Curated annotation (Swiss-Prot):
One term under GO cellular component: mitochondrion
N6,N6,N6-trimethyllysine: modified positions: K104
Database matches in InterPro entries: ATP_synth_F0_csu, ATP_synth_F0_csu_DDCD_BS, ATP_synth_F0_csu_sf, ATPase_proteolipid_c-like_dom, F/V-ATP_Csub_sf
Presequence extent in this chain: 1-61
Site residues by UniProt (Reversibly protonated during proton transport): E119
Protein name: ATP synthase F(0) complex subunit C1, mitochondrial
Gene: ATP5MC1
UniProtKB keywords: CF(0), Hydrogen ion transport, Ion transport, Lipid-binding, Membrane, Methylation, Mitochondrion, Transit peptide, Transmembrane, Transmembrane helix, Transport
Family: Belongs to the ATPase C chain family.
Cellular localisation: Mitochondrion membrane
GO molecular function (one): proton channel activity
Post-translational note: Trimethylated by ATPSCKMT at Lys-104. Methylation is required for proper incorporation of the C subunit into the ATP synthase complex and mitochondrial respiration.
Length: 136
């Protein structure tokens, strides 16, 4: 049977590993003073802690780009809904005016209010689509 001491990895072996494979936890383990004081003579300088930079692969960037386009397309659907809402508002204005011409001014003011709200929602959806595409 092997003892637990034989399973431990020596600090020299850990230092000789590739920098990309050293994890931040092991880097903090290596930066303890008792391990640095027992450095072999062949290591000329102090132990350099490996820094991991944020790197993305080509596949990950492609997935992010596809997600941007899907999100922007979903936000653009709201612009089409705005167009349908504007058509409904003015269609209802025509029907209401045909039924009761004496309410022309009140119906027109409600139609303008409905148009403004519908157009505002469409512009908001378009703004979100542009934010998804160009700000993220």
């Amino acid at each position: 049977m092997q003892t637990t001491g034989a399973l431990l990895i020596s600090p020299a072996l850990i230092r000789s590993c590739t920098r990309g494979l050293i994890r931040p936890v092991s880097a903090s383990f290596l930066s303890r003073p008792e391990i640095q004081s027992v450095q072999p003579s062949y290591s000329s300088g102090p132990l350099q802690v490996a820094r991991r930079e944020f790197q993305t692969s080509v596949v990950s960037r492609d997935i992010d780009t596809a997600a941007k386009f899907i999100g922007a397309g979903a936000a653009t659907v709201g612009v089409a809904g705005s167009g349908a809402g504007i058509g409904t508002v003015f269609g209802s204005l025509i029907i209401g005016y045909a039924r009761n011409p004496s309410l022309k001014q009140q119906l027109f003011s409600y139609a303008i209010l409905g148009f403004a709200l519908s157009e505002a929602m469409g512009l908001f959806c378009l703004m979100v689509a542009f934010l998804i595409l160009f700000a993220m």
